[in-house]
Amino acid sequence: MEQHIYLIGMNHRTASIDVRECFALTEHCSKDDWAIPLIKGIQESLILSTCNRVEILAVGDSNTPEIILSAWAKVKTRSIEELVPHTYTYQGRSAISHLFCVASSLDSMVLGEPQILGQLKDAYKLATIAGASKTILNRLLHKAFSVAKRVRTETSIASNAVSISYAAVKLAKKIFGTMNQYKAMLIGAGEMAELAAMHLMQAGIQQLKIVNRTYSQAQELASQFRGEAIPFEKLVTYLAEVDIVISSTGAPQTIIHFNDIKNILSKRKHYPMLFIDIAVPRDIDPNVHQLDNIYLYDIDDLKEIVEDNIVQRQDEAIKAKHIIQDEIDSFCAWLQALILQPTIVDLRKRFSTYAEEELERTLKKIGPVDRKTREALETMIDALIRKLTHDPISYLKCAHRTIDTNHITLARQMFNLDKIPQTNKAVNED
């Protein structure tokens, strides 16, 4: 069976946050989401779901994209017609290139941001635990990690790199100006919250409150930044005391509702509040922006803020893409050998079988020959086999640089290779 590498996904360029949150595949969602790797017909897979993208990397036959899209829509209880217009599909070399760009943060909203590599490593860990990442994806993901490291080492793409959290705090400064007279709350205690806390403290925020479902994690983060840890169940109570709220949880649904905010406005005497929701799915009810003196921004609203960052890093991105092309060639050479080897072995075996049969038939006709003559005949036959198989093998190696197995199928049919008894056959996957 022919196998190919596919990457099917959506990101901040192809889908708005309204769409991305509908199709997010987070750990907090139904376990069925993570059953996608185990669907019949897909040999290997990995799911990467972040605030800006959902991507499924897979090894399978030509039906793989359709299988994945159908399963994806099904686990999110949506129609495939709602999903497909916002997705992209890459195959073979294009899929590998896209993955390497993602790992190196060349495809991120914030060019050069460091979070995506950690998120990809987490996704790989989940795939290995599920038994979904095997020979090809194991090699491909480790190559992606080394590519990202090389890009960061050999270019300045990550120098003074900003993050989504940085952009969120920059937006707060743009709206409020001097920060030293305001109080802030962070909802979530992960890496994005930690970065936001750091930038808020650097901006001079007067007071910082940390809320998280796991209270001990809120305490740990609060201790790093002289903040106050708040139990999750008291979130709404303490909202009235802060001016800026940055939320970045992995919750599967809204945690701050319209009425929550409406009810605290009178306590604040309608003093303005800024909410920055960088979670996908969103943590804060989008309708909150309808309330007077409430300013709500989501992750898509941060695009303008990071445009300067993209312009400043374009030259380094060009250098990074050259590195990526080199590494694609390296991986494809390994993949080519993995996929081609069984066919090359079978081709030589087929010619050797024919040659041995003809040699024995000829020797029976001419009668016994001495050892020296037999060795000479065998040497001649070996040389003839090498010459006869040289051009077909060279063609296969040259054609396979596109990571397309159609020519392998043709060669196997042409030389009737699938009827050769197989022993210890190498993995034939793309």
UniProtKB/Swiss-Prot annotation:
The record marks 98 as: Important for activity. It comes from the Bacteria. Transmembrane segments: none annotated. NADP(+) binds at residues 188-193. Pathway: Porphyrin-containing compound metabolism; protoporphyrin-IX biosynthesis; 5-aminolevulinate from L-glutamyl-tRNA(Glu): step 1/2. Substrate binds at residues 50-53, 108, 113-115, 119. Pfam families: GlutR_dimer, GlutR_N, Shikimate_DH. InterPro entries: 4pyrrol_synth_GluRdtase, 4pyrrol_synth_GluRdtase_dimer, 4pyrrol_synth_GluRdtase_N, GluRdtase_CS, GluRdtase_dimer_dom_sf, GluRdtase_N_sf, NAD(P)-bd_dom_sf, Shikm_DH/Glu-tRNA_Rdtase. The active site is at residue 51. It is an enzyme of class 1 (oxidoreductase). Keywords: NADP, Oxidoreductase, Porphyrin biosynthesis. GO terms for biological process: protoporphyrinogen IX biosynthetic process from glutamate. Gene3D superfamilies: Glutamyl-tRNA reductase, N-terminal domain, NAD(P)-binding Rossmann-like Domain. It catalyses: (S)-4-amino-5-oxopentanoate + tRNA(Glu) + NADP(+) = L-glutamyl-tRNA(Glu) + NADPH + H(+). Belongs to the glutamyl-tRNA reductase family. Possesses an unusual extended V-shaped dimeric structure with each monomer consisting of three distinct domains arranged along a curved 'spinal' alpha-helix. The N-terminal catalytic domain specifically recognizes the glutamate moiety of the substrate. The second domain is the NADPH-binding domain, and the third C-terminal domain is responsible for dimerization. During catalysis, the active site Cys acts as a nucleophile attacking the alpha-carbonyl group of tRNA-bound glutamate with the formation of a thioester intermediate between enzyme and glutamate, and the concomitant release of tRNA(Glu). The thioester intermediate is finally reduced by direct hydride transfer from NADPH, to form the product GSA. Homodimer. This is Glutamyl-tRNA reductase. It comes from Lawsonia intracellularis (strain PHE/MN1-00). The lineage of its organism: Bacteria, Pseudomonadati, Thermodesulfobacteriota, Desulfovibrionia, Desulfovibrionales.
